[in-house]
């Protein structure tokens, strides 16, 4: 039996395209939700006077994907702390929200809102409301990015690559229990899909990070806690994004080709068990999009 949720994520062109890429989603429809006018037109909604949010109706198979997983992935596609703005789009019609028509979904949805609050250190401004009305958008807005591959999209292209990577990695890891094997497959798949200079793990052993599975050129064997980018991420228990490695105090240069770097801690319970280290040959490669998705990938481990 199919179920339905409604997601307001900014411009519905990009939001619909994002949800179409989620395994278990069977149908998507862009439209206008939770306003004060029946059957509005795009031109009316655009005035920001009707109260509607650009929204995507998502029909999904709960045997394949859960409401909680849809909300988790949705949060990875938006800036949940931005009020009435996503990307370059500004106005109440671009506010973010999750609208439900089945109250039994509410506990699972709320749990993902709480998880987002913990990760962000603040409550999302994303609305969580029952659906009060939804009207499909005009035909020209449906499947917009399929019809116009070069059309405007407020989401970065790498968000779609990470979405596919995240889903495929979950299937690849399956029920394998060995952490080293899981790290090895993760490093391999990230390298295959994202083409970074170096991708690998350092494992926490005592007071030292010790080199684990990786893809790339030979690297440092050991890094002390608090040293370099990897040791700093371990000590802080937070992701560290470095736009220019030459500007990071105490940077440990394992490769002269590395220009920017991101390090994500792998946390179990309250303890860091490893860090995921990724380097790029270009300056400023990594940003909040990379951080959000790579943190979700580390949660799979």
Segments from the language model and where they lie:
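Acidic-histidine catalytic/liganding microenvironments
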Residues: 22, 141, 193, 242, ...
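Short glycine-/small-residue motifs
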Residues: 274-275
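Intrinsically disordered, low-complexity terminal regulatory regions
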Residues: 164-221, 296, 300-301
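Juxtadomain coupling helices with adjacent low-complexity linkers
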Residues: 170, 280-301
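Regulatory sensory and allosteric helical modules in signal-transduction proteins
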Residues: 204-256
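Flexible coil/turn and secondary-structure edge motifs
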Residues: 1-165
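A short, aliphatic-rich beta-strand micro-motif
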Residues: 260-267
């Amino acid at each position: 039996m199919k179920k339905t949720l409604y997601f307001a994520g900014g411009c519905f062109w990009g939001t619909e395209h994002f949800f179409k890429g989620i395994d278990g989603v069977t149908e998507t429809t862009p439209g206008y939700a939770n306003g004060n006018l029946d059957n509005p037109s795009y031109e009316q909604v655009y005035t920001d006077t009707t109260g509607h949010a650009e929204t995507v109706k998502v029909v999904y198979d709960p045997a394949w994907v859960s409401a909680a997983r849809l909300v988790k992935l949705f949060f990875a596609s938006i800036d949940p702390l931005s009020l009435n703005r996503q990307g370059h789009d500004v106005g109440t019609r671009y506010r973010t929200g999750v609208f439900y028509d089945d109250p039994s979904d509410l506990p699972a949805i709320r749990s993902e809102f709480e998880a987002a609050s913990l990760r962000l250190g603040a409550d999302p401004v994303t609305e969580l409301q029952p659906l009060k009305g939804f009207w499909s958008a005009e035909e020209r807005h449906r499947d917009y990015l399929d019809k116009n591959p070069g059309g405007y999209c407020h989401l970065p292209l790498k968000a779609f690559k990470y979405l596919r990577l995240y889903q495929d990695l979950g299937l690849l890891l399956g029920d394998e229990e060995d952490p080293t094997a899981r790290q090895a497959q993760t490093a391999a798949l990230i390298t295959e899909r994202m083409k970074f200079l170096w991708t690998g793990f350092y494992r926490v052993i005592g007071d030292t990070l010790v080199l684990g599975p990786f893809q790339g050129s030979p690297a440092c064997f050991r890094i002390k806690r608090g040293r370099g980018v990897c040791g700093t991420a371990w000590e802080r228990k937070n992701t560290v994004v470095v736009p220019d490695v030459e500007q990071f105090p105490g940077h440990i240069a394992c490769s002269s080709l590395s220009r920017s770097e991101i390090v994500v801690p792998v946390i179990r319970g309250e303890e860091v068990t490893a860090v995921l280290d990724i380097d790029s040959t270009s300056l400023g490669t990594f940003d909040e999009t990379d951080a959000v998705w790579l943190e979700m990938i580390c949660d799979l481990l």
